[in-house]
Amino acid sequence: MSLQKSNKITPFLTFDRQKWAELRKSVPLKLTEQDLKPLLGFNEDLSLDEVSTIYLPLARLINYYIEENLKRQTVLHRFLDVASPKVPYIISIAGSVSVGKSTSARILQALLSQWPSERKVDLITTDGFLYPLTTLQEKDLLKRKGFPESYDIHRLIQFVSDIKSGKRHIQAPIYSHLTYDIIPDQYNVVDQPDIVILEGLNVLQSGMNYPSSPHNVFVSDFVDFSIYVDADEDLLKEWYIARFLKFRRSAFSDPNAYFHHYSKLSEQEAIRTASSIWDEINGLNLKQNILPSRERANLILIKGEDHAIQTVKLRK
């Protein structure tokens, strides 16, 4: 039995790293070190061992879910006596700023596009559905960026609804971390892929997070499998500050960068600034809006100090 024993009532099965790795079975590792490098986040050093131990078992599990989903679609369309449109399988990945959601999303995209057969897997981030910078400034929301009210949630819900309706050539806005803004007139086009991975802070949130923007459906209503990437807040803050310091020496040095002025800070000033941003914005958003959505996920990946995933929780 590959489960950790607990007397606590929980909707999750809990696996340690070793037991989860055993569930890989015979799934082949097709990624090389060269393939892995461009998938990693700015402040992450993830190994092929992590891919084999954590992400290959996860890819195997998701493939089982996809197979069952296709069977259910076939049954429904047979019952309705209608032709079967191509409806992508949607995976969502949520979690805090600096936890490594984007890296997890890119690794899953690479694995699921190669095994068990070649498939088209699109990756979309919800950053593109933030309001443009001018709108955030007009609404006095710059210090609330990433909070529920900073998103055009109706547009995001329409986007995922169109995907699940089998529509073609659906446009997703593109966000630039350099300019801190939506790129005008540029889009990612989703055209009936096999899988869509939707990554962002808000993909598990519900109507309680949007009291001033009521609607009857949420992003999670259209998601087939949801993942939450978790870590202790102390680690998240530490990783955020480390990433900020690296950006200060690289991306922020670009004169076109929105945060170019941070490149002129001393190291101690940069640490204080990053710590303050975490406490006043990212940490607050984590406590109020992101962390409360964790228990809605189908799978929780819990990271330790070295960014390696130590525990996996799978909804029963």
Curated annotation (Swiss-Prot):
Top-tier EC class: transferase
Q: Which GO terms describe its biological process?
A: coenzyme A biosynthetic process
Q: Which UniProt keywords apply?
A: ATP-binding, Coenzyme A biosynthesis, Cytoplasm, Kinase, Nucleotide-binding, Transferase
Annotated residues that bind ATP are located at: 95-102
Q: Where in the cell is it found?
A: Cytoplasm
Q: Which GO terms describe its molecular function?
A: ATP binding; pantothenate kinase activity
Question: Is Acyltransferase one of the keywords?
Answer: no
Any one of the GO CC terms:
cytoplasm
Instruction: Cite a single Pfam family from the UniProt record.
Output: PRK
Which EC number(s) does UniProt give? 2.7.1.33
Pathway assigned to this chain's UniProt record: Cofactor biosynthesis; coenzyme A biosynthesis; CoA from (R)-pantothenate: step 1/5
Please state the span of the N-terminal signal peptide per the UniProt entry.
Answer: none
Would the keyword ATP-binding turn up in this protein's UniProt record?
yes
Q: Which reaction does it catalyse?
A: (R)-pantothenate + ATP = (R)-4'-phosphopantothenate + ADP + H(+)
Family, according to the entry, reads as follows: Belongs to the prokaryotic pantothenate kinase family.
| NCBIfam families referenced in this protein's UniProt entry, alphabetically | panK_bact
Q: PANTHER family given for it?
A: URIDINE KINASE
Q: What is this protein called?
A: Pantothenate kinase
- What is the species of this protein? Actinobacillus pleuropneumoniae serotype 7 (strain AP76)
**Encoded by which gene?**
coaA
